[in-house]
Amino acid sequence: MIGRIAGILLEKNPPHLLVDCNGVGYEIDVPMSTFYNLPQNGERVVLLTQQIVREDANLLYGFLTPQERTTFRELLKITGIGARMALAVLSGMSVQELAQAVTMQDAARLTRLPGIGKKTAERLLLELKGKLGADLGELAGAASPSDHATDILNALLALGYSEKEGLAAIKNVPAGTGVSEGIKLALKALSKV
């Protein structure tokens, strides 16, 4: 399974990307939340991915944050929600907004998303309740510890640390810290473990 892609962004045409990794071009679909935060064509990009193998296709879905990928995976577990619908949910609202809607059992908020009717919204609320995880629940009520958390996490992943280690280390980085200083603080926290 392909869990992460790092390479040069060649093309972006919502919601599709083409990323060159050592001469191989990977087509990746991303939610709009990820799409709007991508670098320019020709720049390096790191995406966490979810590979879906079907009888007629081998598909890759990409995300800038571990929370988006985790939420995508949880959405796929729900009956009647496929990859396209899960991508539409993450394109229509942030992970924090989804976690908040689930916590508040706000079906009306979910029905505003394209392709989500009342029954589907109620199923989402029922099946996601308590499954978004502690990290996502914390995100629903609070801002991330650092404004550059995604960049810092991607750097830690590139250095070979796991997502879990990276997320734990980022909690030690104060808000407003720059990327390079944040990486240093995160590495310092990881060296103490």
Swiss-Prot record:
The gene is ruvA. One of its GO terms (cellular component) is Holliday junction helicase complex. Belongs to the RuvA family. Transmembrane segments: none annotated. The RuvA-RuvB-RuvC complex processes Holliday junction (HJ) DNA during genetic recombination and DNA repair, while the RuvA-RuvB complex plays an important role in the rescue of blocked DNA replication forks via replication fork reversal (RFR). RuvA specifically binds to HJ cruciform DNA, conferring on it an open structure. The RuvB hexamer acts as an ATP-dependent pump, pulling dsDNA into and through the RuvAB complex. HJ branch migration allows RuvC to scan DNA until it finds its consensus sequence, where it cleaves and resolves the cruciform DNA. The lineage of its organism: Bacteria, Pseudomonadati, Pseudomonadota, Betaproteobacteria, Burkholderiales. This is Holliday junction branch migration complex subunit RuvA. Keywords: Cytoplasm, DNA damage, DNA recombination, DNA repair, DNA-binding. Residues 144-193 are annotated as: Domain III. One of its GO terms (molecular function) is four-way junction helicase activity.
